Amino acid sequence: NYSDIAWYADVILPESTYLERTDCVQQANGLKPQMFLRRQAVEPRYDTRDGAMILKQIAERIGTGNFFPYENMDELVRWQLEGTGFSMEDFEAKGFVAYGKKQIFMDRRDGLKFKTPSGKIEFKSSLLEDAGFESFPVYEPVTAPSGGKFRLVVGRNALHTHVSTQNNPYLNEICSENELWINTEKAADLGINNGDPVAISSPVGSGEIKAKVTDLIHPEAVFMLHGFGHEAKKASRSYNKGVSDSVLQTNVYDKIGGSPAYHETVVTVKIA
């Protein structure tokens, strides 16, 4: 199941799938915090290894193996659990262990502390203001796209995980490619019918995708599922199916947090 990144690689170190490996201990926070552990269920089908073992063996080859003092995944997990009061055997019944039977609520009078200069919720952040950022900005109206241009909106569905499952035989049969949702009236203006191949382009990339004409989308926007448009030819089922939204996304980001702004790209749509 080649990814596009693996397709470009000179050397591939294949990791076992989630059913074929034991993972590190993970923690879930909340009112009833707990730790959970995914254990190997079946033997690997091919010459693959656990991710932590791949890292250890690379480290040994470059002389830093002393930073990875374990010989297998069980040893690593037991080391993680040292001092917690839990053992690997405690996970066998349910796959997780809770820190206690009761929910842990915050002490609302004395225990609710905020890491702000005032110790309170700051709608106008003094930390951001002191760093030169306007922390309580005024509303700026957004210019509506026109002339065959639309705001690109992307999202996911419950059938696929990121870009890693589109070549899975069963999931590919259910959802093999993404479509471009476009408003019925806007599609009519552009001469686009449901199922027509359309050309979509942005200032940084382009592609061809099938149109899904619907009333269930805003006239100023178009929508596509994330995770398609694979370029790896050995991923034969997902290769060249649909369009990757990453090809179209312009480099716009949140200047304070640094996160990408996924819905700030304007695209042009026309009959292919």
Write out the residue ranges for each language-model feature.
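Long, contiguous, secondary-structure-rich segments that constitute the structural scaffold
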Residues: 41, 45, 50-94, 168-181, ...
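Short, well-ordered loop/turn elements at secondary-structure boundaries
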Residues: 7-9, 109, 117, 146-148, ...
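Glycine-rich, flexible loop/turn motifs
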Residues: 21, 31-33, 38, 63, ...
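Short, glycine-/Ser/Thr-/acidic-enriched flexible segments
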Residues: 1-3, 18-20, 41-42, 47, ...
